[in-house]
């Protein structure tokens, strides 16, 4: 029996197989061979297509199973780590409505800083453990204010790892 680990990063998706009983690493691969592209339409913006993550996740899983000669039916659990604070918004069919605004995008920092001022330092530190300057919620509010036609169609919003799961 085996564990499958996935790491959905902004440069690649990694897949690793570990033997469940011994903890021995069997094989680790990453897709694509070169880095995934990041779209930057303006300064301080950074976006990626969630469907590209999905494509490379599927490719990496198939590769790690094939190259290790492990039957996928012997995988007993899957763990996912991923880039934080990325905003993925989908419609009722689970299709992304726009590219994901990822962790290194700074367009919504002022929105987060305004929230910090309104909420106050005590509340932010006790509930958020940080200033919400670049948090996903700030990015969601940016979409609401700047792309209302997209915001109206949102069925669910999530982080990159949730989209993959």
Predicted regions mapped to residue ranges:
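N-terminal glycine/serine-rich phosphate-binding loop of ATP-dependent small-molecule kinases
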Residues: 1-98, 110, 126, 153
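Gly/Ser/Thr-rich active-site cleft segment
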Residues: 2, 8-10, 123-165
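Residue-level signal for well-ordered alpha-helical scaffold segments within enzymatic catalytic domains
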Residues: 59, 63, 114, 142-145
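Short, flexible helix/strand-to-coil boundary loops that buttress conserved ligand/catalytic motifs
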Residues: 91, 116, 147
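Carbohydrate-associated surface elements
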Residues: 105
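Hinge/lid segment of periplasmic solute-binding proteins
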Residues: 109-120
């Amino acid at each position: 029996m085996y564990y499958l680990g996935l790491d959905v990063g902004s440069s690649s998706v990694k897949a690793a197989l570990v033997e469940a009983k011994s903890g021995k690493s069997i094989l680790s691969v990453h897709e694509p061979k070169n880095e995934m592209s990041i779209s930057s339409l303006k300064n301080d913006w950074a976006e990626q297509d969630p469907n590209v993550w999905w494509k490379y996740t599927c490719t990496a899983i198939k590769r790690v199973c094939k190259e290790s000669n492990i039957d996928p039916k012997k995988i007993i659990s899957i763990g996912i780590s991923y880039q934080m604070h990325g905003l993925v918004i989908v419609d009722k069919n689970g299709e992304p409505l726009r590219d994901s605004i990822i962790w290194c995008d700074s367009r919504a920092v002022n929105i987060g800083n305004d929230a910090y001022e309104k909420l106050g330092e005590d509340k932010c530190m006790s509930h958020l453990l940080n200033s919400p300057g670049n948090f996903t919620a700030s990015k969601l509010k940016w979409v609401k204010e700047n792309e209302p036609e997209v915001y109206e169609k949102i069925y669910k919003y999530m982080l990159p790892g949730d989209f993959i799961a």
